[in-house]
Amino acid sequence: MNALTLNARRSLALLTLAAAWSVAGSAAVAADSYDSAVQHAGRSADDVKRDSLDHPAEVLRLSGIKPGMRVVDFLAGDGYYSELLSYVVGPGGHVLMLNNPSFERFSEGGAVKRVANDRLPNVEHQVLDLNPLQWPAASLDAVFLIKVYHDLYWVDTTGVWPKVNTSAVLDNIAHALKPGGVVVIVDHSAKPGTGSTVASSLHRIDEDYARKDWESRGLKVVGKSDALRRPEDARDHVSYLPPAVGKTDRFVLVFRKP
C-alpha cells in the first residue's frame, strides 16, 4: 500500500470516527464528554466490564482533558485508557499509547489489536525503552500513569523487568508538559510511611511519597478523588494476586505544571 492510499484511508477513518463521536455525543442525554467516552458504542465488552472497577469517567473528568489535546497513556498495557482518551481528545487530538518492551509483552497483543486497521486513527502505538526517555519540552498536555507509577520503582531480579532510571524518567515527563499540563496518577496504596519500599514486593506505593515525588519537580496537586478507595484493604498483599486483586485501595491524584 503506498503512502497516498494509506493517508487517504486514515483521513476517511478520522472522518468516520468524528461522525461516530458526533452521533454518540448527541445521543448521550445530559452526558459530558467523559461519560460519552465511557458510553461509546465502539468499546469492547471486556473494557466495559472493567468500568465498574476502574470508574474511568470520574478519573477523566478530574483530569480536565479536552478535545484537541496531546496526551500520553504511559505504560498503557493493552490500551484500555488509550481508547477512552482517544474519544475525549477527538480527531484533532493525539494519544500516545506507550509501552516498554516488558509491558508490551504483558499486554499479550492487546495493544496491537486495539489499533489494528486504523481503528483509532488518533492513537499512536509506540514501544520503546524508557532509558532514556527524551520527549521535547512543552510538547504534552497530559500524561496518565494508571496503576503503573509504582513500576518505575520496581527492582526485578528475574529479568522480567529492566531497571528504570526513575529520576530521569520523571524529570523528562515534567519537562515535556506544557505550562498548565497535568500528570494523572492512579495507583495501589501502600501503608503510610513505606515510601517506594514495597513497589517490588507488593506492587504498591505510598500516596504521600507520590505527592512529594511530583511536587519536588515543580508540579502541584490540583485534584484528588476517593472514587477508588477500599478502606477494608489491609495494604499488605500483592496488588495483582488474590486476595487483593480487584480489591485494592487506590489513590487518584492530578498534578499540574505551573
Where are these regions (language model features)?
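Class I SAM-dependent methyltransferase Rossmann-like catalytic core
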Residues: 34-62, 66
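Short glycine-dipeptide loop
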Residues: 68, 91-93, 177-183
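Conserved class I S-adenosyl-L-methionine
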Residues: 68-77
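Glycine-rich SAM-binding Motif I of class I
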Residues: 79-83
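A short glycine-rich, Lys/Arg-flanked "PGG" loop and its adjoining helix->strand segment in the class I
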Residues: 86-87, 160-179
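S-adenosyl-L-methionine
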Residues: 107-137
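A short acidic, Gly/Pro-enriched loop at the edge of an enzyme's catalytic core
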Residues: 133-143, 147
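Core SAM-dependent methyltransferase catalytic element
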Residues: 232-258
